[in-house]
Design a protein with these regions (language model features):
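Amphipathic alpha-helical linker/stalk segments
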Residues: 62-91, 136-141
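C-terminal peripheral helix-coil segments that are non-catalytic and often amphipathic
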Residues: 1-3, 98, 102, 130, ...
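Amphipathic alpha-helical segments used for helix-helix packing
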Residues: 101-123, 171-178
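Hydrophobic alpha-helical connector segments
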Residues: 77-108, 154-161, 189
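Helix-turn-helix
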Residues: 13, 17, 25-59, 63
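N-terminal intrinsically disordered/low-complexity leader segments
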Residues: 1-13, 20
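All-alpha amphipathic helical-bundle segments outside canonical DNA-binding/catalytic cores
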Residues: 87, 123-128, 144-160, 190
Length: 206
């Protein structure tokens, strides 16, 4: 007997629509320029509905930014499931590149928030992100001790991956200009392979 997949509740559907609309509005207008009315219009719901789920613009903005970070953290699950650094790093970089492709607006919002000094999410950086980075540092240091990775600084490796992958979202217009159009799926996959080969090939011990 096939197991039925539960349908999302009305609340889940509404929250999802509002978050998607907010992501687009914040990316285009910034936090200061975005309005709850414009977000409601994008989501196709009455403005009171937005306030019902997210009582303030600040709460909605934080929810959008946290969702972006949670997607990125989930992309690194390979660190927990693989003892092979080449496999884990390849999976992580590939997932981060794919997120840059399908969630470019979220990456732009994150970059804007960080450039503003992270006023909305500093506590999140101090706790969730810091704990996550420390846990990944321990994994990388273990791989180094086991002779699987070259003696590198774990945080520099993470910063390199973040900067390279998020460039394809944050600078999408610049890339499209230089490439005379948006990257095709095939061109994007070639870029992904080259990034993986460069980073992974540069840190894995041979």
């Amino acid at each position: 007997m096939d197991r039925q997949i539960a349908k999302p509740s009305i609340r889940e559907e509404n929250e999802r629509a509002i978050l998607a609309a907010a992501e687009a509005e914040f990316a285009e207008q910034g936090f200061g320029g975005a309005t709850m009315a414009a977000i409601a219009a994008r989501a196709g719901v009455p403005k009171p509905n937005v306030y019902y789920y997210f009582p303030t613009k600040e709460r909605l903005y934080r929810a959008v930014v946290e969702r972006v970070l949670n997607e990125w953290l989930e992309a690194a699950s390979s660190f927990d499931t693989s003892d092979d650094p080449a496999e884990a790093l390849t999976s992580y970089i590939s997932a981060k590149m794919d997120l840059a492709r399908v969630m470019p607006l979220g990456s732009k919002i994150w970059a804007s928030e960080i450039m503003r000094g992270a006023p909305a999410i500093q506590d999140f950086l101090d706790t969730t992100l810091t704990q996550w980075v420390r846990s990944r540092e321990r994994v990388v240091r273990r791989w180094i001790a086991e002779g699987k990775l070259k003696p590198i600084e774990p945080r520099v490796l993470l910063y390199m991956i973040w900067a390279t992958t998020q460039q394809y979202a944050n600078a999408a217009h610049e890339i499209a200009t230089l490439e005379h159009g948006e990257l095709s799926d095939a061109a994007f996959e070639r870029a992904k392979r080259q990034i993986i080969e460069t980073i992974v090939g540069g840190v894995v011990a041979r």
